[in-house]
């Protein structure tokens, strides 16, 4: 499909720079068939029924944004690195700026004057450079010591559409982490999960809705634009995910008994669909996935999707267009813009019922 079909105009003032407070006070646009209903996240339980199963991503965002200087040569330009993929105990793939200032063999010292990790400076050598500004960094520390050094020196890896407008601060360490965060490895938050609070979780449990955890370590590729003119030419980024045998069995039993699977975020959906067999049975999973979902895809595992509002021409807007229909989503986004919804990572959400899929009962007047 032509990628320009997924383009739309978004006023800059619609991009949220901070999350709603409390988190579950964010707006929620319910999209089912031709109907659009303006609600709030706190009303989510009313749209679900006993036996339904929520699936949340429990990945934890690391402090993947590092600042430092090239050292050992005549000039020492400032370098910014965003860690995007762990390769082994001491090596990471990273996006760096300015990439043109670096060659293989260069050394970078991360940390500012007076800001060092507990074990001292964190140095890295550039092992290799890629064509898209990515480099392979080999660090001076290994394993848990490296993890601690990154935590000491790094900043929250806010998306470019936020970081370009303000500097990340200490509040982002809390704001850019879901209440489910447990397994370190993400360099971007599974943002639909940011809306959840203990009170909302309790209300869902009282409704008889199950809550299930899976892990997909979100990579920085989630922010990368689609640069080709046709979706067939786009290469999707790979991310590591796991679904336990116990979780897979619980979801399969619930669906067999008439319960619906609600993915909290596109990361949970992509993982579930990657793990589903042709008949919709969810299998245990521990692997990378690079699934790229566009209109025409047949969904096998997920009935309902809670997700934020995404960038124009992004793989995530393509995914929601596949889930609910391109024209429906274009109309929903136009409605959201007109009604003052807040977009992207810190923004509001929409609750999508799969096109041609599950029934919905509106619990309140339009």
UniProtKB/Swiss-Prot annotation:
Q: What is its main location?
A: cytoplasm
Query: What's the EC number here?
Result: 2.4.99.17
GO BP annotations, alphabetical order: queuosine biosynthetic process; tRNA wobble guanine modification
Q: Which UniProt keywords apply?
A: Cytoplasm, Queuosine biosynthesis, S-adenosyl-L-methionine, Transferase
Annotated GO MF terms: S-adenosylmethionine:tRNA ribosyltransferase-isomerase activity
Cellular location of this protein?
Answer: Cytoplasm
Question: Which pathway does it serve?
Answer: tRNA modification; tRNA-queuosine biosynthesis
Instruction: List the Gene3D superfamilies.
Output: QueA-like
Gene Ontology CC annotations of this record: cytoplasm
Q: Which reaction does it catalyse?
A: 7-aminomethyl-7-carbaguanosine(34) in tRNA + S-adenosyl-L-methionine = epoxyqueuosine(34) in tRNA + adenine + L-methionine + 2 H(+)
Q: Which family does it belong to?
A: Belongs to the QueA family.
Instruction: Say what the protein does.
Output: Transfers and isomerizes the ribose moiety from AdoMet to the 7-aminomethyl group of 7-deazaguanine (preQ1-tRNA) to give epoxyqueuosine (oQ-tRNA).
Summarize the subunit comment: Monomer.
Query: Which HAMAP family does its entry note?
Result: QueA (MF_00113)
Q: In its UniProt entry, what is this protein called?
A: S-adenosylmethionine:tRNA ribosyltransferase-isomerase
* Organism name: Bradyrhizobium diazoefficiens (strain JCM 10833 / BCRC 13528 / IAM 13628 / NBRC 14792 / USDA 110)
> Gene encoding this polypeptide?
queA
